[in-house]
Design a protein with these regions (language model features):
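Intrinsically disordered, low-complexity segments enriched in small/polar residues
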Residues: 2-3, 7-11, 15-103
Length: 103
């Protein structure tokens, strides 16, 4: 059986009511240039911070940005909430629940 570990700062709720409380936060480090005269700066993304080593039978729920970085690093044990799926439930413009996860 697969164990899900939520490494986002939010409780993730599936459409069936299953909830995954936050168990920590994985993120991608970043650095910024100074703002130009138009108020625009450049961002450079770095390493993933807060993502544990791979564990057999564990999938880590992470943000889409962390998922992208993890995939680029060869990780296959990360998923992100399917916030763009047509079955995602929204109320007043906010996501209430998702139908599942994307890899």
């Amino acid at each position: 059986m697969t164990t899900f570990v939520n490494l986002t700062p939010h409780c993730i709720t599936l459409n069936d009511g299953t909830q995954f409380p936050s168990a920590g936060v994985a993120r991608v480090s970043n650095s910024f240039t100074d703002f130009d005269r138009n108020g625009v700066c450049d961002v450079t993304f770095g390493d993933i911070v807060g993502l544990p080593n791979t564990q057999n039978g564990v999938l880590y729920i992470v943000s889409a940005l962390v998922l992208s970085a993890a995939k680029a690093a060869g990780r296959t044990d990360c998923v992100a909430p399917a916030t763009g799926h047509p079955d995602c439930v929204r109320k007043d413009g906010f996501i209430v629940s998702v139908p599942g996860f994307v890899r």
